[in-house]
Structures are given as C-alpha cells and as structure tokens.
Amino acid sequence: MSPSVLEPQSVPTLVNVGLKAVGRNDAPVERDARGLSKPLLELMPTLGTDAFTFSPIRESTVSRAMTRRYFADLDAHAETDIVIVGAGSCGLSAAYVLSTLRPDLRITIVEAGVAPGGGAWLGGQLFSAMVMRKPADVFLDEVGVPYEDEGDYVVVKHAALFTSTVLSKVLQRPNVKLFNATTVEDLITRKHHAESSSSSDDGEAEDEAKVRIAGVVTNWTLVSMHHDDQSCMDPNTINAPVIISTTGHDGPFGAFSVKRLVSMKQMERLNGMRGLDMQSAEDAIVNNTREIVPGLIVGGMELSEIDGANRMGPTFGAMALSGVKAAHEAIRVFDLRKAQNDKC
C-alpha cells in the first residue's frame, strides 16, 4: 500500500455545527456464516407476513424531522469556514482532505445537481471503469478503494465505486454539510486591502480595484433555472473566508466562478480549455491549482478555462490530486483570510 496523503501534525478540536451529535452503535455486529447480521436474518422471514409492520408515524413527524434539521444546517452554515462549490471528484477529494486534517473547520459543500459526483459516476464514453495514473493511487489507498495495478496506471472496476466511497466518507464527517440541488449564483466580495501600501505578507500588491472573495450567493437550482420566466426570486448567502471552486469546465453550471471573475473585471479574459492531451493536462491541473484571487481557490477542470490547459479526457488522477492540492492551499491561506474576513 502507498503511504497516506494525510500527515496531520495534530488533531484540532471538532467543530460544533449546531446540532446534537449523531448517535452511532459502534458495537460489533453479530453475523452468521453467510455474512448477514443476526437482526436482519431474524427480520427476513417476517417480511410479507402479518407479523411484519413498521413503527407507527404521523406525516407531520416526518416533515418536522426534515425541516428542523435542514433549517438548523442553514443557520449553522450561514457563517462557515470553507465553501466548496461543486461536488465532483475534485471537490469531494478536497472535502475529504480538509475534513480529515481540520476537523475544527466548518466545511460547506454546494452542489447544483441533485446527485453529487459530477462526471465521476462513469469512465469515458459512459463506460464503467475509472482509470487513474500514478501517483493518484495514493489517494485510492487513502480512502480504501480497490483497483487493478497496471504499472503506470490503476483501474477501478467502476467509477461509481470511487465516487460513492469518497462521498460516503465525506458525508459522515460531523463538520461537513452538503447542500445539493443548490446552485451558487454569485460571489460575495469585499474590497481587498493588502497588508501594507506596497505589498502584503503573502506578496499581494495593493490594488484599489482588487476584490477579496468573502462568500457565495446561493439559490435552489430549479429557481435559478427559471429567472428568465419568473421574477422576484432573490437568493440567500453564505459567508466564508475561503472558497474552493471546482465547478468543472465550461458548461451550464461549469467554470462559474472564473467566468464571474471576468465579468467583475478581476480577470481580463479566460484562455479557454485546449484540446485533449492526457500527458500534459493532468500535471498542469494539479501543479497550478491555486488561489486565483484572495479568498478563491480554483481546482479541477475549471482551472483549465483560466490557464488554457489541455483537457485530459477519461483519466481521473488529476481530479483527485487537484482536490488534495486545493485543500492544502485552503489550509495555507485560511488564517490570513479569516483575519481579513473577521474585520467586516
């Protein structure tokens, strides 16, 4: 097995997200020789008989159980530490690393689709297998996804195995909340002031026109899709000192943040994703994952629209490791951005 990508020097205190801790039964489950638990085996013969019935419930109980928790999450994450825009392979990988290394941080994932995972449920041309070039196998080892080792690359038997594994691990973290079927409609901005009149501690030049990203503007995806035929559907907001945008290459919701930077005059133009070149594309995406403007880190294929990088097609190693790099960058700049964000 390859060494872990995660080497935390200390384990910070777990963040309190506003709800009571999730109850878990960590006691070992008794199983028979066939592998099923004793309670399930005892239940099976009753299914379809008069002896089987669910516990009683009233419809309003279900409504309140969902509503209470969702609005508690909205309240808890209105002010968060890190927002990840887009829950594809890059965004989920970033969420995994962040929530592991910094359990003290509140991490909010905003995904436009009902189903998280982006394009990582299948390989190329709707085929099942997922190919990752080494050293991305290190991340597969980290999350426990099995694969076939083919020398310079590895093959996961079904892309959904990777996505569902990372997704399940991320969603179990108490400091992570996923808001799916929710889109980011805009970015919250503040005028960016460098630390001195010439440059800041991290080398940022003073520029009166420069902005710092201080959160995201959200709405239900279905509402966002109908702004042209309905009126007065104002959004909601989430404040955060660091945003990681991993919305993919240009498309209906793709490359959203970087396109918005152009319209806000923070970038002159996008260079546009180039044609497919697996050899150069993956290195470029991982190595150039970075903070584009203060408070906004861009990773994955969204980055290709800024840099004019090649697309890599159906090989996914760069998506996973770009997420790892994005998490590393977020941790690196977090204290500075939080200090700036707390001033306003």
Swiss-Prot record:
InterPro entries per UniProt: FAD/NAD-bd_sf (IPR036188), Sti35 (IPR027495), Thi4_fam (IPR002922)
EC number(s) stated in the UniProt entry for this protein: 2.4.2.60
PTM characteristics: During the catalytic reaction, a sulfide is transferred from Cys-232 to a reaction intermediate, generating a dehydroalanine residue.
Cofactor(s) named in the record: Fe cation
Reactions that this protein is recorded to catalyse: [ADP-thiazole synthase]-L-cysteine + glycine + NAD(+) = [ADP-thiazole synthase]-dehydroalanine + ADP-5-ethyl-4-methylthiazole-2-carboxylate + nicotinamide + 3 H2O + 2 H(+)
Modified residues (2,3-didehydroalanine (Cys)): 232
Subcellular localization, as worded in the UniProt entry: Cytoplasm; Nucleus
Bound cofactor: record note: Binds 1 Fe cation per subunit.
Keyword annotations of the record: Cytoplasm, Iron, Metal-binding, NAD, Nucleus, Thiamine biosynthesis, Transferase
Family annotation (Pfam families): Thi4
Binding site for substrate: 90, 111-112, 119, 184, 234, 249, 301, 311-313
Superkingdom of the source species: Eukaryota
Stated family: Belongs to the THI4 family.
PANTHER family: THIAMINE THIAZOLE SYNTHASE
Task performed by this protein: Involved in biosynthesis of the thiamine precursor thiazole. Catalyzes the conversion of NAD and glycine to adenosine diphosphate 5-(2-hydroxyethyl)-4-methylthiazole-2-carboxylic acid (ADT), an adenylated thiazole intermediate. The reaction includes an iron-dependent sulfide transfer from a conserved cysteine residue of the protein to a thiazole intermediate. The enzyme can only undergo a single turnover, which suggests it is a suicide enzyme. May have additional roles in adaptation to various stress conditions and in DNA damage tolerance.
Subunit-level organization: Homooctamer. Interacts with cyp-41.
Identification of the protein by name: Thiamine thiazole synthase
Biological source species: Neurospora crassa (strain ATCC 24698 / 74-OR23-1A / CBS 708.71 / DSM 1257 / FGSC 987)
